[in-house]
C-alpha cells in the first residue's frame, strides 16, 4: 500500500481511519513533542521515528555523530517497521507539518551525518511507496 504525505493530521483523521498508520517524529525518552506526537504516542495507529535523545531544542537533546551507529540503528528499526507495514498492504500517512516543525539547522549543526542518513532513508521510502 502507499505512503501519503498530508500537510496536517488531526486527531479526527486518526480516529476516523482505523486501518491507517500515522508516522511522527519521536525521541528516545518518548516525551514532549507536538500535540500530534503526544496523541499518536498513545495510539496503536502511531509509529514514532526516533530522531533525538529527548524533547527540546538544546544541544543536549540531540544525538551527535559520535553516536552515529546508535542513532542509525534506532532509525533503521523505526523506518523498518514502517516498511514492513507497507509491504503488508497497510497505508501510512506522514504529517508534513509535524516533520516541518523540527529544527533542521540544529540537526545540521549537531549531527549532520545522522541527519543525512535520516533524510536519505525517508526520501527512499517516499520514492518507493508514494503513489
Where are these regions (language model features)?
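Macrodomain-like recognition of ADP-ribose-binding/processing modules
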Residues: 1-131
